[in-house]
Amino acid sequence: LGSTTMNWVRQGPGXGLEWLVSYYGPSKNAYAPEIKDRFTASKDTSNNIFALDMKSLKTEDTAIYYCVGQRNYYYFDFWGQGTMVTVTA
């Protein structure tokens, strides 16, 4: 992961891609307003882990979540395989 900017995006059922967070460093991150107080991204470079802690989940959080690496300012370079998260009432 190194100095790569990491991001989380998601795709809900029948919806387009939605940006959630860009991780620039331990205290330099940008969050989408709808998840800012509920989701927290963290990066462990030594173990190549980029995590998303999600709390107070809502049914509308149901989606496939992708971690995405960004070495170039203008586009996402590489994508994780995605993880399906289903939230039921």
From Swiss-Prot:
<protein>
    <recommendedName>
        <fullName>Ig heavy chain V region HC-3</fullName>
    </recommendedName>
</protein>
<feature type="region of interest" description="Complementarity-determining-1">
    <location>
        <begin position="3"/>
        <end position="7"/>
    </location>
</feature>
<feature type="region of interest" description="V segment">
    <location>
        <begin position="1"/>
        <end position="69"/>
    </location>
</feature>
<keyword id="KW-0391">Immunity</keyword>
<dbReference type="GO" id="GO:0002250">
    <property type="term" value="P:adaptive immune response"/>
</dbReference>
<feature type="region of interest" description="Framework-3">
    <location>
        <begin position="38"/>
        <end position="69"/>
    </location>
</feature>
<keyword id="KW-1280">Immunoglobulin</keyword>
<feature type="region of interest" description="Complementarity-determining-2">
    <location>
        <begin position="22"/>
        <end position="37"/>
    </location>
</feature>
<feature type="region of interest" description="D segment homolog">
    <location>
        <begin position="70"/>
        <end position="73"/>
    </location>
</feature>
<feature type="region of interest" description="J segment homolog">
    <location>
        <begin position="74"/>
        <end position="89"/>
    </location>
</feature>
<keyword id="KW-1064">Adaptive immunity</keyword>
<dbReference type="InterPro" id="IPR013106">
    <property type="entry name" value="Ig_V-set"/>
</dbReference>
<dbReference type="InterPro" id="IPR036179">
    <property type="entry name" value="Ig-like_dom_sf"/>
</dbReference>
<dbReference type="GO" id="GO:0005576">
    <property type="term" value="C:extracellular region"/>
</dbReference>
<dbReference type="InterPro" id="IPR050199">
    <property type="entry name" value="IgHV"/>
</dbReference>
<dbReference type="Pfam" id="PF07686">
    <property type="entry name" value="V-set"/>
</dbReference>
<dbReference type="GO" id="GO:0019814">
    <property type="term" value="C:immunoglobulin complex"/>
</dbReference>
<feature type="region of interest" description="Framework-1">
    <location>
        <begin position="1"/>
        <end position="2"/>
    </location>
</feature>
<feature type="region of interest" description="Framework-2">
    <location>
        <begin position="8"/>
        <end position="21"/>
    </location>
</feature>
<dbReference type="InterPro" id="IPR013783">
    <property type="entry name" value="Ig-like_fold"/>
</dbReference>
